[in-house]
């Protein structure tokens, strides 16, 4: 079973790390590096060492000195995917996280209501879990959550 999980994890990492990039220079009519003269190379190196001014700005996706939020040049900046993971994968992950959080909140609500019906108070829960002594961290977290829920239930419900 561990081997199967390991194979799945390696496959997932391989899938996520695969990238495909296409250079815009390959399809453009700009001169290639073999066509540059010494004067062009000198100009380029001077531009690279300029610290201030407009020449220091880098436009990685186009050669236009336009606002990067506008997509009226041929680079279509707004439509480009820039994350490590595609947006479909991140949407699936966020849906799974939200579903898990909702399920967990419902389960805690039901458990706390059951505990209250059985007559459990924060004081009796603290005694039973030995809060203040050598209690485990998870017990302290349950106690804190139940106490907050119990106080909220009794103040909001008006009972």
UniProtKB/Swiss-Prot annotation:
<keyword id="KW-1043">Host membrane</keyword>
<comment type="function">
    <text>Effector protein that contributes to pathogen virulence. Targets members of the RABA GTPases subfamily to inhibit vesicular secretion, leading to an accumulation of secretory proteins in the endoplasmic reticulum.</text>
</comment>
<feature type="region of interest" description="RABA-binding domain">
    <location>
        <begin position="109"/>
        <end position="159"/>
    </location>
</feature>
<dbReference type="GO" id="GO:0033645">
    <property type="term" value="C:host cell endomembrane system"/>
</dbReference>
<dbReference type="GO" id="GO:0016020">
    <property type="term" value="C:membrane"/>
</dbReference>
<dbReference type="GO" id="GO:0005576">
    <property type="term" value="C:extracellular region"/>
</dbReference>
<dbReference type="GO" id="GO:0020002">
    <property type="term" value="C:host cell plasma membrane"/>
</dbReference>
<comment type="subunit">
    <text>Interacts with potato RABA GTPases including RABA1a, RABA2a and RABA4a.</text>
</comment>
<keyword id="KW-1032">Host cell membrane</keyword>
<keyword id="KW-0964">Secreted</keyword>
<keyword id="KW-0843">Virulence</keyword>
<keyword id="KW-0472">Membrane</keyword>
<feature type="signal peptide">
    <location>
        <begin position="1"/>
        <end position="18"/>
    </location>
</feature>
<protein>
    <recommendedName>
        <fullName>RxLR effector protein 24</fullName>
    </recommendedName>
</protein>
<keyword id="KW-0732">Signal</keyword>
<feature type="short sequence motif" description="RxLR-dEER">
    <location>
        <begin position="58"/>
        <end position="82"/>
    </location>
</feature>
<comment type="similarity">
    <text>Belongs to the RxLR effector family.</text>
</comment>
